[in-house]
């Protein structure tokens, strides 16, 4: 079973592809339902800094830290889904596991895990 955090566009499509093996975690829950986690929670753009200055931090970091806190005492497989923003200007796509991250803005810094 896979605990899915964040059933937005990517999470919802993953869920529909692997529905029998995936359980969506309620947005207010921090404790995973299984030892395998797919974490896709994120704000959807990098323009919140103009009118909701703490939204990216609250969404991208606080919730992540609270979920990770529940994972401290046991062994979990934690898959964190990020975005191309973390590679910054001059980044090459497709990125690989060894690609250098060079975030250029506040949103992308919160996504660099």
Predicted regions located by residue number:
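Short, glycine/charged-enriched secondary-structure capping and boundary segments
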Residues: 18-19, 51-54, 92-96
């Amino acid at each position: 079973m896979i605990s899915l955090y964040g059933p937005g566009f990517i999470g919802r499509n993953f869920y529909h592809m692997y529905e029998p093996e995936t359980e969506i975690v309620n947005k207010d829950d921090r404790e995973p339902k299984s030892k395998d986690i797919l974490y896709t929670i994120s704000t959807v753009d990098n323009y919140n800094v103009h009118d909701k200055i703490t939204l990216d931090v609250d969404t991208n970091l606080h919730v992540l830290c609270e979920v990770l806190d529940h994972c401290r005492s046991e062994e979990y497989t934690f898959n964190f889904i990020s975005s191309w923003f973390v590679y910054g200007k001059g980044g090459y796509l497709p990125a690989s596991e060894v690609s250098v991250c060079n975030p250029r803005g506040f949103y992308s810094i919160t996504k660099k895990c």
